[in-house]
Every structure is written in structure tokens, then in C-alpha cells.
Amino acid sequence: MIDFDILLEAYFDCRRHKRKTVGATEFEMNYMSNLVQLLDEVNSRQYKIGKSICFVVKYPRYREVFAGQFRDRILHHYIALRLEQLFESQFSDRTYNCRKGKGQLAGIRQLQRDIREVSENYTKDAHVMGIDLKGFFMSIHKPLLAKMVDGFIVENYHGDDKEDLRWLCNMVVMHHPEKDCEKKSADYLWEFLPKEKSLFTNGEDKGVAIGNLFAQLFANFLLSKLDWKINYYCKHHVRYVDDMVLVARRKETLLRLMPMIRETLASLGLRLNEKKFYFQHYSKGVRFVGAIIKRDRIYSVNNTVNNYRKSVRNLNGAAKTGNLEHIEKCTQSVNSYLGIFSHYNEYGMKRKIIKEELDKESWQYFTVKGHFQSIHLRKKFDTDIKYKNMANEVLNRKIEDRNDVPNESEISRLLDSGYELEIYATQNGRIRIEGFPPS
């Protein structure tokens, strides 16, 4: 039987950063009863996965995403809590996605160290080979993955909920969300997706839904077999999801690995994306997970720089609207890029773009902190905009709700007499209207 305390912990993990969503709010209104019901359903084998929502994202490329109901996602977190540490003991240190203490930046830094080590501090030749998998998540064979996960649990897991965990993992892996889902995107958007990139058209028992927590966890587990085989022949390599880069002194060392890599992937029902294969000297630069790694320098790829430029431009429009929520959203977008660039050698670029794209009128609203580390709304404008938004919110209410606003006939009389009116909100949220006589 599954453990209620772990299920409760999974619930708290699941709602983190999601408390304002509709599903999380509805579940939280009576969360203890809902958790007990979910517990009983799993332990009695009556649990059924609910309807998912499905949509297509257009950036950075068209991609199909499925999102399960909140109660289903709680069980995904339950699975992660029970298996993640066991999986960690099986993973290679060269796997960097969705792992504590790892991540995208850590993978980039490791690859930079590998190149420096193999080239003996850039004094010798070194070559890099980049490989990518074709339609990775959509190519995963469900029965094979379910069998591998079940075998791992049988051999390595010894908790009291072992049988329940096996049943639950098999259910989520073999689930077909495309057969019971609500589309949130227009149908024509699916026309931009190749058939092998959609669960609706890529074939029976193929593909796991991008958007569910277990997809990343189980995908790492699936590719751990390839990681260890590569590690046996080439210890200088890094993998982030399906993006891999290998480093070696001699070209032949890397090229001899290709048959083994293809054979291992074929045994997992996967294959290489031949269009994304590259092989070159390290001095030409190495592209990996959004970064260009060169000797002693790391730059962002052009797509990231262009998106940063667009986010700065959006600040101009936000400042003109005076909408605080819009301004904060645009500011957060710019700061997210500045945060990324702070780890790279990009000071000149981020400074140049802000100076080029932020117009003079907008500059009065914002201040830049540090060496272009972040941008913030000036405090005096922050307060002014809040009061302005409060006034607009009240004035846009129905007339009967505006008890604290002077009579409209009085306002009309003052205007007809040539008075200038100033409408503003006080700190306690009340609306004040002051009239200034004609000069």
C-alpha cells in the first residue's frame, strides 16, 4: 500500500509554484479528503488517469505538449520521490538534465573543462563530435520502457508499496493521453508538426508525453545504458537530454564509436538525427544547449541574443501603457536573459542592446543595477503606477460600486465651469478627485 506521508509530500511538491492554477486551487480547497480518496483509489486499484489537456507551443519550434490533471501529477511526484534516488545511483556523472546539482550551466562548464583537459590547456589538438537523437520523446517504445522500469523496481526497490509502485509506473508509462484529452490549441497548428512529432500520428505504443514529470525521469533512465557504454570508450563526454558531445584527441577514436552508438540506440528503439551530427576541431567552437564554447570564452547562441533584444523592446511598449502588471512581466523577461548572460562572456552585448533598444522616454522609468546584472522600475514610478492602476480599476467599475467617487453630475458641473480635475488613488485605496479653478 502506498504511504500517505509520502503522498502528502508529493502533493506539496506538486503544488510548489502552481498554487494559483485552477487545478491546484480546486484540489487545495479540500486537499486532505482529496488525498485520502486518491490513496484509496490507488491501493484498491480503482485509480484511473484523468483527461489531459493538449496544446501546441510555437517557440522555439512547434511542439506538442500534454498536461495531466493536478491529482494525476501528484502521483507523478510520488513516483519521483520513490525512485529518483535509486535512479541517481544508476546514472552516469556525465548526465546533466533534471538532476540535483547538475543542470544546463553545469553541463556547459563540464564540456569546457573536458576540452581544456584533452587539449592539455589548449596546447594540443582535440576534436569534438556532437550527436542528437531523432524525435527522442516521441520515439520511445512504451512497452520496452515499462518493462525496463518494472525490472528495475523488482531488483532495486524494497519498500512496502513495491507492488503498488510497479502497478502505478506501468499505468503512467502505458497511458495514451491522446485518446482522452482536451485540445487547447487550434487544430490547424497540428499541421505544422511532422507525423512523427505527435502522439496522435506517430504510431501505436510510441512516445511519452512531453510535459509530465515522469517523462524526463524515465527518459534519463532509458539512456543511462548508452551513457555507460560511451563512458567505457570515451570518458570525456556530456549529455543533456538527447544532446550529446564527445571529446577526444584523435578523430579515429570518436569515429570508431559510431557503430556502437547506433547499435545501442537501435536496441532501445531510437536512432540518431543525421542532420544534427557535427565533427570538428575544438578551436572552431562547440555548440551545446544554447551556448557556444570557445577557448576561455562562452557565448550565447544568436537565437537567445535576438530574443533578449525583443524583450528589451517590449519594455518600451510596457512603459507607455503604464500597466504595472505588464511592466513587471516584461522586466522579469529581460532579467531572466540578463541572469543567463551573467554566466557567459556577454557584458558588452547585454549593455549594447539595452542602450540601443531602450528609448529615452523609457529610461526615466528604469534603473540598471550592477554591471547590467538586472533592470528595475524606479521606486517613485513604481508607486505612481500602482496608484494610477488603482484609480483606473475603480473608475472602470459599475457606477453603483463607486460609492467613494463624487457624484457624476458634480464632476460634469466642474468640467463645464472650466475646472481641471485630477483623479488619483490614496494609499488606503480610496479615490480622490481634486478640482483646480481656471487660471
Could you say what each language-model-derived stretch is?
Residues 1-36, 381-395:
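Non-catalytic, polymerase-adjacent accessory regions of viral genome-replication enzymes
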Residues 17-25, 50-74, 90-102, 176, ...:
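Short, conserved non-catalytic motifs in the polymerase core
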Residues 28-51:
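Amphipathic alpha-helical blocks
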Residues 68-69, 77, 189, 194-205, ...:
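Right-hand nucleic-acid polymerase module
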Residues 80-141:
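Active-site-proximal segment of RNA-dependent polymerases
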Residues 114, 120-241, 246-258, 262, ...:
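Conserved polymerase palm-domain catalytic core
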Residues 405-421:
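A short, charged, amphipathic alpha-helix used as a generic interaction element across diverse proteins
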Residues 422-425, 431-435:
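Short linear proline/tyrosine/threonine-rich motifs used for host-factor recruitment
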